[in-house]
C-alpha cells in the first residue's frame, strides 16, 4: 500500500479549513486554521534564519496548549525532528532527554521555564517560551536577530497578505523517515527514546479515520485532555482531529474532575 505524505495531510487540512476554528486554549484565544498557518510560517522563518536545518532536533516541553501544537506542527512541516517531552518530568530527566536527543532548540511552557537549568543543557542553541515564542535563552547571534526581527522578515516575505497558496510545507521523501523521538517515562532509570517515523503518525491517523471517521466531521469540537507529548494523546486527541478539520480545545491546566465537568458543559464536545 502506498503511504501518502503525512505533512501533505497537515497542509491539505490547513488549506481546506482555512477560515474555520482550529485551536483554542480554554477560556483563552482561538486560532483559526489560517492563524495556525501564519504562526507556523513565522516559526519556519525563525528556524531558517537561526540556522536550523532539515533533520535537526527540536524539543518541546510544556502543558497542552494551542502554541504547543503550533510549534510541533511547525517542527515537522519544516523537516526538523520533534522531541516532545512530558512536562511532568523532573528537571534532571528533561536535561537528560534534551542532551541525549541532541536537540538544537527547546520550547518550554510557563512552569517548565522556571524549573530547568540551561547550564545543564550546554549544546542547546536556544530556549523558546511557548506562550509567546519569546527567547528565554539564546546562545547564537543568528537566533537573537531572527527573533527580534521576525515580524519584519515576515512582512518582507509577504508584503501584502499571507494566503493559502503560500502554504508549502516540507514533504517527507520516505515514510520511514524519522519524524520524532518519543521518550518513555523511564521506569528503569532515565527515559528511553523511541524513534517514530512518519508512517507511524500516518498509520495512527488512518486507523482513527477507519474507526472514528464517520463520527467526527470538520468543525466538531474536541477537548484534549491527555498530554500531547504522549503518543496516544498526540495521535487521537490532536493529529487526527486536526487533519479532519476539527476545533480542538486545550484545558492548559491539570484536568481535575471539576474543570473537566465545567469544560464539557461549556464546550459540549
Show where each model-derived region lies.
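Short hydrophobic/charged patches on amphipathic alpha-helices used for structural packing
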Residues: 11, 44, 94-95, 170, ...
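Conserved pre-ATP/AMP-binding loop-to-beta segment of ANL
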Residues: 18-19, 147-183, 190, 215-221
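AMP-dependent adenylate-forming
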Residues: 9-32, 188
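A short helix-loop-beta submotif of the ANL/AMP-binding
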Residues: 56-57, 63-83, 87-91, 99-105, ...
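Conserved AMP-binding/adenylate-forming core of the ANL superfamily
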Residues: 2, 21-73, 90-95, 198
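Conserved structural elements of the adenylate-forming
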Residues: 37-42, 163, 175, 194-215
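Structural core segment of the AMP-binding/adenylate-forming
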Residues: 9, 50, 77-156
Amino acid at each position: 500500500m502506498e503511504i501518502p505524505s503525512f505533512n501533505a495531510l497537515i497542509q491539505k487540512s490547513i488549506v481546506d479549513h482555512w477560515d474555520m476554528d482550529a485551536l483554542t486554549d480554554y477560556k483563552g484565544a482561538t486560532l483559526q486554521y489560517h492563524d495556525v498557518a501564519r504562526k507556523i510560517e513565522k516559526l519556519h522563518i525563525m528556524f531558517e534564519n537561526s540556522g536550523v536545518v532539515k533533520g535537526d532536533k527540536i524539543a518541546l516541553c510544556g502543558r497542552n496548549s494551542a502554541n504547543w501544537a503550533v510549534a510541533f506542527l511547525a517542527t515537522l512541516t519544516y523537516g526538523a525532528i520533534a522531541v516532545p517531552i512530558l512536562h511532568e518530568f523532573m528537571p534532571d530527566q528533561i536535561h537528560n532527554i534534551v542532551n541525549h536527543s541532541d536537540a538544537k532548540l527547546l520550547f518550554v511552557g510557563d512552569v517548565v521555564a522556571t524549573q530547568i537549568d540551561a547550564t545543564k543543557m550546554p549544546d542547546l542553541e536556544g530556549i523558546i517560551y511557548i506562550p509567546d515564542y519569546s527567547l528565554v535563552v539564546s546562545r547564537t547571534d543568528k537566533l537573537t536577530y531572527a527573533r527580534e526581527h521576525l515580524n519584519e522578515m515576515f512582512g518582507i516575505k509577504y508584503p501584502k497578505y499571507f494566503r493559502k497558496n503560500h502554504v508549502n510545507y516540507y514533504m517527507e521523501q520516505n515514510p520511514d523517515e524519522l519524524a520524532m523521538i518519543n521518550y518513555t517515562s523511564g521506569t528503569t532509570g532515565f527515559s528511553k527514546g523511541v524513534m517514530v517515523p512518519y508512517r507511524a503518525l500516518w498509520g495512527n491517523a488512518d486507523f482513527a479515520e477507519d474507526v472514528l471517521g464517520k463520527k467526527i466531521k470538520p468543525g466538531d469540537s474536541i477537548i484534549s485532555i491527555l498530554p500531547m507529548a504522549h503518543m496516544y494523546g498526540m495521535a487521537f486527541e490532536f493529529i487526527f482531529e486536526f487533519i479532519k478539520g476539527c476545533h480542538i480545545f486545550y484545558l492548559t491546566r491539570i484536568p481535575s474532575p471539576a474543570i473537566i465537568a465545567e469544560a464539557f458543559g461549556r464546550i459540549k464536545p
